[in-house]
């Protein structure tokens, strides 16, 4: 657990460093908040993909998958719980590091709570989509691993609506409905596809 938390800390240190480089490079230019938000979300996407990839590589090797298959719990349930734990871990670290990111990118702190809620809702979908990517890319077949890129377009709606939500009032609850609905959509098929890939492609 300590090792996994240290991995998350390293990922968010990367986000802070990358944000600092972006902020320093454009310190004499008036930056629109949408640009700063885009930078944060792209870095968050990268952090999620790397984090989920490492967790699935370590926690779903051949021997552990065999143990999970003989467990009283369905593999889909195990995948769901694992993904929720990853979400909570990432959301907590984002909450802790976001004040520094806000300062670096000169974002308005009046949106601090709303953006953290937005990030948490985004993380739910990002992690569940990334679990499909990770389960395929960790397969023994390099040919099948290449097909994991087909899940990448699923990330695009989150980026579009995250930036688009700035045009709406972040205090308006309706601006978060898409993220909740998109998570429910991913929840319907992600654990099934992930568990299928783990069972079939890793053997």
Give the positions of each predicted feature:
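Hydrophobic alpha-helical transmembrane segments in multi-pass integral membrane proteins
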Residues: 155-169
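Hydrophobic alpha-helical transmembrane segments that constitute the membrane-spanning cores
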Residues: 80-106, 125
């Amino acid at each position: 657990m300590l090792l996994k938390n240290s991995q998350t800390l390293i990922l968010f240190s990367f986000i802070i460093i990358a944000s600092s480089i972006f902020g320093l490079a454009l310190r004499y230019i008036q930056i629109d908040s949408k640009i700063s938000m885009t930078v944060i979300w792209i870095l968050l996407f990268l952090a999620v993909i790397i984090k989920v990839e490492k967790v699935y590589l370590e926690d779903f090797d051949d021997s552990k998958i065999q143990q999970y298959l003989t467990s009283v719990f369905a593999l889909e349930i195990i995948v769901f719980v694992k993904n929720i734990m990853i979400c909570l871990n990432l959301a907590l670290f984002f909450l802790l590091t976001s004040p520094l990111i806000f300062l670096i990118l000169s974002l308005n702190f009046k949106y601090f709570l709303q953006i953290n809620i937005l990030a948490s809702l985004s993380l739910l979908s990002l992690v569940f989509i990334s679990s499909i990517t990770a389960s395929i890319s960790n397969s023994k077949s390099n040919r099948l691993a290449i097909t994991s890129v087909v899940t990448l377009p699923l990330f695009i709606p989150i980026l579009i609506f995250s930036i688009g939500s700035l045009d709406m009032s972040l205090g308006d609850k309706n601006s978060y409905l898409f993220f909740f609905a998109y998570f429910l959509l991913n929840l319907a098929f992600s654990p099934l596809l992930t568990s299928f890939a783990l069972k079939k492609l890793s053997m």
